[in-house]
Swiss-Prot record:
Species annotation: Homo sapiens
Organism ancestry: Eukaryota, Metazoa, Chordata, Craniata, Vertebrata
Name by which UniProt lists this protein: Protein FAM118B
UniProt KW Phosphoprotein keyword: yes
Gene designation: FAM118B
Function, in words: May play a role in Cajal bodies formation.
Transmembrane segments: none
Length: 351
């Protein structure tokens, strides 16, 4: 019979415990071959609220539409911009989950006097209050996500977002790199972005808080783009010819702005190959989402069971994709300000 010490040793080995007494690390999810073999220039990254919420979880306005409207309402109340009855009405609409786009539109109208001068609107003040000092509110795990996004951009990927914040641009600036924020009010720049002439620009399809006049909540707000056939054709060609990778997006494809830009005129969507990274969570909900998205040409992929699994999964994916992009000669020296090492390496992996 084996000694007690030997038995303990065998048990430790069976359960994967080592000298430090730590349990084995969780086995990482495998990367989907059809995604990991993409090159950066073949991708359009779509950044949703889930990414912003992961980067700065202490900012409620980043977590959802409802959270943003509540934060704007709180700011308006703090600045004494609403009558008691008005604030009660808005609070009631939020509590009852009324159409949030309409609620947001009504609130913005209330904060914006009848003038074309954005500087004279209180809406701008409320926005700046809501998104104040975002740099100091970023968490390290969230920065890892932004680092991966930035690395793919440097290697040729395009980026668009449904978010109003500029967290990615702020992170890039902290790394000594300059990204441009675009919105749909500038048709010329949007066209150049779609033609891949502004790869180091982030397209905010709802606008960005630093330019309140460019914020749109409904397709009616950017008819100039929708009526510009050249711009729309270039935008839709992206959805037909590239692979969109949805990050932290959930149901972004149901967003009226996204649909108007990318989905409505695109035929045979089920023949396309796009990807959506989501937390597995509830199994039935996951299966339902996967089935619904396949009709739109989107493969739903689980990065893990917990939100905390995303940064590491996306980092591994970025390393794999960037390696292929670099070997194909995608990295161009001097593309961004900063050292050449930044172009070829991401922390924890070599490309």
């Amino acid at each position: 019979m084996a000694s007690t010490g030997s038995q303990a040793s065998d048990i430790d080995e069976i359960f994967g415990f080592f000298n430090d007494g730590e349990p084995p690390t969780k086995k990482p999810r495998k990367l989907l071959p059809s995604l990991k073999t993409k090159k950066p220039r073949e991708l359009v990254l779509v950044i949703g609220t889930g990414i912003s919420a992961a980067v700065a979880p202490q900012v409620p306005a980043l977590k959802s539409w409802k959270g943003l409207i509540q934060a704007l309402l709180d700011a308006a109340i703090d600045f004494d911009l609403l009558e008691d009855e008005e604030s009660k009405k808005f609070q009631k609409c939020l509590h009852e989950d009324k159409n949030l786009v309409h609620v947001a539109h009504d609130l913005i109208q209330k904060l914006s006097p009848r003038t074309s001068n954005v500087r004279s609107t209180f809406f701008k003040d409320c926005l700046y209050e809501v998104f104040d000092d975002l740099e100091s509110k970023m968490e390290d795990s969230g920065k890892q996500l932004l680092q991966s996004v930035l690395h793919l951009m440097e290697n040729g990927a395009l980026v668009l977002t449904t978010n109003f914040d500029n967290l990615l641009e702020l992170y890039a600036a902290d790394q000594g790199k300059q990204l441009e924020s675009l919105d749909l009010t500038d048709e010329k720049k949007v066209l150049e972005w779609a033609q891949e002439k502004r790869k180091l620009s982030v397209l905010h399809i709802h606008g960005v808080y630093t330019n309140p006049s460019g914020i749109v909540l409904h397709p009616a707000g950017y008819q100039n783009v929708l009526r510009n056939t050249e711009v729309m054709r270039e935008i839709q060609k992206l959805y037909e010819n590239k692979s969109f990778l949805f990050l932290g997006c959930g149901w972004t494809v149901d967003d009226t702005t996204f649909q108007a830009l990318f989905l409505e005129a695109v035929k045979h969507k089920s023949d396309l190959e796009h990807f959506m990274l989501v937390r597995r969570g509830d199994v039935d909900e996951f299966k339902k989402l996967r089935e619904n998205m396949l009709d739109k040409g989107i493969k739903v992929i689980s990065y893990g069971d917990d939100y905390a699994d995303l940064p590491e999964y996306f980092k591994r994916l970025t390393c794999e994709i960037s390696t292929r992009g670099t070997s194909a000669g995608m990295v161009r020296e001097g593309q961004l300000n900063g050292s050449s090492a930044a172009h070829s390496e991401i922390r924890g992996c070599s490309t």
